[in-house]
């Protein structure tokens, strides 16, 4: 039988170093017998750890602590912090002043989620992380995780750097990088307005450009930008054109005449012959009769010249007769088609098309940016749907020399919702990975995305969601358990993220690089570093 040490022996040490954080008389004696200012595991089970810290010290939600137990280090992530004490009842509202209670009897209780464990010996940590299947010994020492205790993560990170590991409110020097090999398994970026989605995408694209310039790219990235944020940037920052060392890995097309004088930018042109009747379905709410007429076009007219034919009087008559629809229906359809052509000046009746160059760019592993400011939402979706169709048609044919492809969709709930009229992106979500085509869905409202489609996404970047229904949809669809991180997701600040992907051992708290700072680091003259600590906004 172990004899408990005399409590008086440790009285002064206890008060000066731990401020008397206690629970019961037996635990009080045990804790006081352990020198140093580290804290101790007190409870609970394999799903949750609890320890206490002085009442005037802080522990952040999301902060990672380590628990030392013999030759192992257990890692645990804070999910909640509570005021607690050894007093009974509502003592804190029934007293006045500070003379009526003992500071050694009040403390903060920290509840932490176990993440896993690694060897204490640094030389044995490589590839040694594993899930914890037991609990640390009671009263094992607890301390805030140090930078070197995250070194094991470097071996699990990918090649597309996006930020650094964030431990609570502190940034570490461990780079956070996504995996090129996972990009055809789809990625979701979820955040409310102002949380840094556009900055994340510019950082992501910059890393892809760097890899392509070094001949290390595994996929091409297609971005259709309806807001003009990525090409030149804007008042608040810079764009991809400012990343001079890697412009050879960027192909730019624009509908904005102001950009056509730039040597790096080509005018976006789409030939009428590129368009199929199914492509224009997204541009209007068609009646049943008009939809029947559209679906009849492909069997009545030549596959590539149908637009020119239907605009001709003879073509209109042929469609009326063979599709068995009224002249009024055909007249309305033709007027809508003429309206589409007049509003989308990049659609040309003759001349070359940008689509072959776009497809060649993604197949060679480059970042292809299509800048379409001032176009309507329907025109944006039409263009993205058309290009995505052509990409899928190309990628269905085997080609060992090409790279995989990722298609970025802004406001993805418009095309991945259960009531969406656009089947093109649903097809990519369900079947794209078989052919090496992935989606990057950006949205503020993941709750509007079809559950089954969202479950196809293996990588999720969560940058703050205020709506509980949005968080629930992401949590139930993620490949890692995010349910315990609900409070942390609510408290994320601009530029902070939780990244969930099967290639890392647990959901990673990250600070995303500020694009303008990351640009400076990517300059060839900049000193080489394994990671980057971003300048706060």
Indicate where each model-derived feature is located.
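Short loop/turn elements that form and flank the Walker-type P-loop nucleotide-binding site
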Residues: 183-185, 215-218, 363-365, 400-403, ...
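Conserved beta-strand position immediately N-terminal to the Walker
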Residues: 187, 370, 440
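Conserved ATP-driven motor cores of ASCE-family P-loop NTPases powering translocation/secretion/packaging/pilus
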Residues: 429-511
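Conserved P-loop NTPase motor module
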Residues: 493-537
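Glycine-rich phosphate-binding loop of nucleotide-binding enzymes
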Residues: 159-254, 418, 422-425, 451, ...
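Basic- and hydrophobic-enriched, low-structure N-terminal and domain-boundary segments
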Residues: 1-192, 199-200, 204-207, 211-215
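Hydrophobic residues in beta-strands of the RecA-like P-loop NTPase core, especially within AAA+ ATPase
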Residues: 224, 409, 442-443
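P-loop NTPase motor domains
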Residues: 206, 228-239, 255-430, 434, ...
